Amino acid sequence: MNTTPDTPTPRALRELTPLEARILGVLVEKQHTVPDTYPLSLNALTAGCNQKTARAPVMNVSEDEVTTALDELKRLSLVMEGSSSRVPRFEHNMNRVLGIPSQAIALLTILLLRGPQTAAELRLNSARLHGFADISSVEAFLDELAARAAARRPAAACAGCAREPLDAPDVRRREHGRLRERGCRRRRGFGAAFRIRGAKGRTEAPRGRSGATQCAGSTDGERTRHRRRRTGRRVLIAS
């Protein structure tokens, strides 16, 4: 009887808080940059979260706040606490929980630590975690991450917009390798505005004098303008 090794199954995860995201980013970063001190103690982890370089935004959190966030991450199995030392030490479990390769983990880590960046910036900033051959390889892994995120997200109405549900089949890979999505820029992603190809027969909101439309149901703090281009595409801009 043939048996196959167990492979990690990606889990449905909730949206992380800024501190939880920062903790995961710090754990992965320090695993590669200072392996001698990894897994990290609570003190070292807090210092990494409050680090003033290679961080955006800069944080000033206490050990108590980090401990609370660690408890939540442990419930999600994203962080594990070691028991081989008298001082508690923590390590990440992202590769197994998310089921993505190390190259994607490297890009995701830099995004967690520094926020939205271009593909060129990601290639430069992730050099210590993984050496990407060129920008196109970075974009390929970003496309894979975006496709996974969209496929794992259940169909739901876009927050603040009275528009169509966001369905996994709406994310398609074209032959030229570019990812197209239907949905709002406020969704989880990499900080980039996705170009959208309007579906035939879909009802569009009326255009205003400026040539832009505003989503129905948006609040003052959550407004999205849809700028249409002559080519039939539109770019979603969060304002």
From Swiss-Prot:
Q: Where is the composition biased (Basic residues)?
A: 224-233
Gene3D superfamilies reported for this sequence: Winged helix-like DNA-binding domain superfamily/Winged helix DNA-binding domain
Q: Which residues form a coiled coil?
A: none
Q: Which InterPro entries match?
A: DUF480, WH-like_DNA-bd_sf, WH_DNA-bd_sf
Q: Where is this region: Disordered?
A: 196-239
Note the HAMAP family from the entry.
UPF0502 (MF_01584)
Indicate the family of this protein.
Belongs to the UPF0502 family.
Q: What is this protein called?
A: UPF0502 protein Bcen_5249
Instruction: List the taxonomic lineage.
Output: Bacteria, Pseudomonadati, Pseudomonadota, Betaproteobacteria, Burkholderiales
